[in-house]
Structure formats: structure tokens, C-alpha cells
Amino acid sequence: MEAQRRSHQEKQTKGHACGRSLPEPRVASGTLISTVDRSSEAYRRLSGTELGRPKLCPQRGRPHSRRRHRTTFNPAQLEQLESAFGRNQYPDIWAREGLAQDTGLSEARIQVWFQNRRAKQRKQERSLLQPIAHLSTATFSGFLPESSAYPYTYGTPPPPAPCFPHPYSHSLPSQPSTAASLALPPQPEDWYPTLHPAPTGHLPCPPPPPMFPLSLETPKSWN
């Protein structure tokens, strides 16, 4: 009986203790008062200040950033990589694995090195081509004509007009030497073409011979 009484008393004391730790909500002036734990620790858990926030650096007050590990290559590794780059700028997986075994580097590091090396070569090529292009435009600009409105044209001259002989040159009899020596002096029409040349493309034709031959005989008087 005594044992039953003791167990009953222990249950009552436990119930009173639970009732004290968990008070029932009370209604005061028509409002419901909640029993949510508003301690600083619980508020931090609910507000999410401790979830997913980067820790601040105590020295500078900045969040810790993920640092990238920079690989340093020794001269022997650089020599092997440069020789492989000279043979093939785009090595496949098998070539990269072979280089990894020879140099002691990982295949991923070798792939990144080849990507950086190709980018460096393209940058060097662009830097070399820029002054050459500027020099070529400045050099050849002096040889070009200032204006192309009047291009150079070389036209062919028209063919010369044929000079036909006079129709009476073959029908007239030959003159004696004495008649030729005493011929009249040339008329202004004969020596005019010599002073004023004919226009381009037309050759001057010789003047026609006199229609009637000259005679040395004097006319007789009709006495």
C-alpha cells in the first residue's frame, strides 16, 4: 500500500511540474496571447540569420571568398608543354594524359594551360596585326589619286582620212623641163597648209596641177 501511495504522489508532483512549465494561453480583453518562445536564440533560428549566411572575416569585415589555387610550373614542365603546343594546339584526351604522366600534372591542369596558351597567342597575333594595318593604310594612301572623279582614259585616235589623187593628174601630158623651171610661183593656197598644219587625223592633199601647160613662144602679132 505504501508503494502505491508513493507512486501516486510522484505522478501528481510530475503533473504539477508539467503544468507549471507549460502554461495555458490566457485571453485578456479579447486578444489571444501566444506562448511562443521569444528568446534571442529561438528568434535567430526562426529568422534564418544562422542559415546560409557567410561568415565575416574578423579582420576586414568581409565574407570569406573561395580562393583559386594557382598552379606554378617549373622550367622542365613549361618546356614540355611548349613543345607539345608547337606540335598541336588542340591535343585530345590521350595526348593530355600522356603529358600528365610526363610532367606530373593533372589532365585538367594541362587542359587549362592549353586554353590559356591559345588565348595568349591570339592576343599576340592581334597586337602584331594592328600596327601593320595602320602602316599599310598610311603608306599606300599617298600613291592613290586624290579624287577618282576623273579617271585616266587612253582613247585611240581616229584613223587618218585617205588622200585621193586628183582626177586630172594622169590625163595631162608630161611637161617639158623648161616649162617646169618657168612655172608660176606657188599660190597662197599651196603653202598655206605648211604654215598651218591640218587638224589631227587628216593629212593635207597636194594641190592639183595647172590645167593648161605654159609655153615659151610669144604670140605673134596679126599684121
Curated annotation (Swiss-Prot):
Principal subcellular localisation of the protein: nucleus
Gene Ontology terms, MF aspect: beta-catenin binding; chromatin binding; DNA-binding transcription activator activity, RNA polymerase II-specific; DNA-binding transcription repressor activity, RNA polymerase II-specific; RNA polymerase II cis-regulatory region sequence-specific DNA binding
Extent of the signal sequence: none
GO process annotations (BP): adenohypophysis development; animal organ morphogenesis; apoptotic process; blood vessel development; cell migration; dorsal/ventral pattern formation; gland development; hypophysis morphogenesis
GO CC list: nucleus; transcription regulator complex
Pfam family name, one: Homeodomain
Keyword field: DNA-binding, Homeobox, Nucleus
Effect of residue 83 to P: Shows very weak DNA binding to a Prop1 response element in gel shift assays; transcriptional activation of a luciferase reporter gene is reduced to 43% compared with that of wild-type Prop1 in transiently transfected human embryonic kidney cells
Location of region: Disordered: 1-69, 168-223
Biased composition (Polar residues): 171-180
Gene3D superfamilies recorded: Homeodomain-like
Family from the record: Belongs to the paired homeobox family.
PANTHER family according to UniProt: HOMEOBOX PROTEIN PROPHET OF PIT-1
Reported function: Possibly involved in the ontogenesis of pituitary gonadotropes, as well as somatotropes, lactotropes and caudomedial thyrotropes.
Protein name: Homeobox protein prophet of Pit-1
